[in-house]
Amino acid sequence: MDKIKAKIDELKQKLDQWNYEYYVLDDPSVPDHVYDQTMRELIELENNYPQFKTNNSPSVKVGGFVSEKFNKVKHKRPMLSLSNAFNDDDLKKFDQDNQNASVDLKGYVVEPKIDGLSISIIYKNAKLHQAITRGDGINGEDVTSNILTIKDIPHYIDQKYKDYEIEVRGEVYMAFHDFYEMNDNLEESDKKFANPRNAAAGTLRSLDNSIVAERKLSAFMYYLVNAQELGIKTHYESIQFLRDNKFKVSDLIVKVDTINEVINQIDCYTKVRDKLSYMIDGIVIKINNLEVYDEIGYTSKFPKWAIAYKFPANVVSSQLLEIINDVGRTGKISYVAKIKPILLDGSMVEYATLHNFDFIKEKDIRINDEIKIYKAGDVIPYVDGVDLSKRLANSVPYEPIINCPSCQSVLVRENDEVDQRCLNIYGCKKINIEKIVYFVSRNCMNIEGMSDAIINKFYDANLIKNIADLYYLQKHKEFILTSDFKIKEKSFSNLINSINNSKKCSLEFLLTAFGIRHVGPNLAKKIAKQFKTMTALMHANFDELTNVDACGEKAALSLINWFNDEHNVSLVNQLQQVGVNMEYIDDFIYDDNINIIDEYKNKTFVITGSFSISRDEIKTILEKYYHAKVKNSVSKKTDYVLVGTEAGTKLEKAKLLGVKIIENEFWKKDNNF
């Protein structure tokens, strides 16, 4: 019995730790299928040995925690989890239990299980009053100011409900394209999110709502808590209520009559799953008749009238051929598994992340091992472990590299970090090249035509050895055009124009482009806005820097150390000499010049194609001066589509729907810029 109790305690400890990682850190260390398998093992043991089952067991309490960063709010009605079904038999048992209750179910409603962060939103006087995360199910975090930045969530509902307190629940998520864009924008030294679910949860818990707005969260709503107070009798009718009040509701929600139809829907969801722009990890099945919910009842953790069917994890095995090491622009060493190519979730996988050496050591991963691969949140290929039964007899443990794969400098670990680093930040070829690649990238100085391949060729030809050399390429024109770079005169001219245009960038883009550790695009803009000039920033002290919103001690020290380095001071001086702007340029530079066109006011716009200024700047103009709404997709409700060069399918859809089209040249002429 002692062994049984010890095993139960071990499983509880694991699940509590994993819950903390998932709900608080937004950074789970194990995939869903491992968590689910461990939970099932715990439940089975507790059922067989009920004397060891406690009220604080993860099998009993709702998973989740309440962060101390936000005000704690008690839910008026507990926000419970859902029990899981993993196969048809589980669903049939769920149905049989409901049928045994001898009530009219009025069928089932089948919904996609969105992989995000659960939220409850309260409306008073028909206005959004408060938004609360699920937390531990009893208490949640007040994230109202962050929720107000999400465009999918209406700030007001129909005035006829002003005498009611309306509570709706749903899931905040991040679409795939927004997830990729956000991760691209993160500083390399920042920890990138593994999947959209972690990104959505981490973003919604940010203390800076400007970051929340910038990262473009979305939300599907799926439950009207007090539907019966409004005279609504079925869950499917409540879904229509949400649609009528401008909440975003999934188009995949269907009503069926029997559990066999539910099972058929699983196949439908499986077929469309890979085509969706957002993550789903299963489907949710709810009894349609709201009037029987209380009769069917609840456990301390789950409602009995609903269940979640979890998609099985697709784990495949392949041979580890090689572990590849690389160095990034900050000197960070990465470990990547090269595997025998294998099909996983519709795409051929040849590489998977290994994070760092500690991960390899913990999993005891060796060359030629048969390793298990899965996609974390259906996005990034990850290594799940090793099939030890297939390990070769002569295999040996993998040893960490000692020297930089580029310059052979001895690697170090700073301040007990898990990552190894190359400290030869001025002499390492790969670091220097990666710095230049980052500097010219779209989210930094946006120098078009300077591809990674061209940068490598120019570096090897001694044309560019550092960032400042980019601004002297014009004098090498004849050599470049007559050498084996395969660059024609027009392409070179466009490249030089793009380099010259980059000199006009506002200070925050230059600051971002320097790639200073812990200083990403968001913080760079706040710092630039605060200090206005490079000179003022270079002379800022620790206290002045940490007074900038979101600038912590690490970022402040990193900035001070960077500007105290003579190499960097020399770089700033060189850039200043060639005319690179060193001042903050306010977003709103059009006040004195812009013409306000009355017919554009309070309209709905969609932007497509390329322009001489960024889409964000155009969006700012439309919202600031015209009080317009800017949407991502064209519909019958769109008033205007603003068209630049290389416009895509949005233009074609606008033509089909008869939406008014504004060409870029007319737009520039109308607005006097």
From Swiss-Prot:
Cofactor(s) it depends on: Mg(2+); Mn(2+)
Annotated keywords: DNA damage, DNA repair, DNA replication, Ligase, Magnesium, Manganese, Metal-binding, NAD, Zinc
InterPro entries, A to Z: BRCT_dom, BRCT_dom_sf, DisA/LigA_HHH, DNA_ligase, DNAligase_adenylation, DNAligase_N, NA-bd_OB-fold, NAD_DNA_ligase_OB
SMART domains, sorted: LIGANc
GO molecular function, one term: metal ion binding
Pfam families: BRCT, DNA_ligase_aden, DNA_ligase_OB, DNA_ligase_ZBD, HHH_2
Family membership noted in the UniProt record: Belongs to the NAD-dependent DNA ligase family. LigA subfamily.
Protein name: DNA ligase
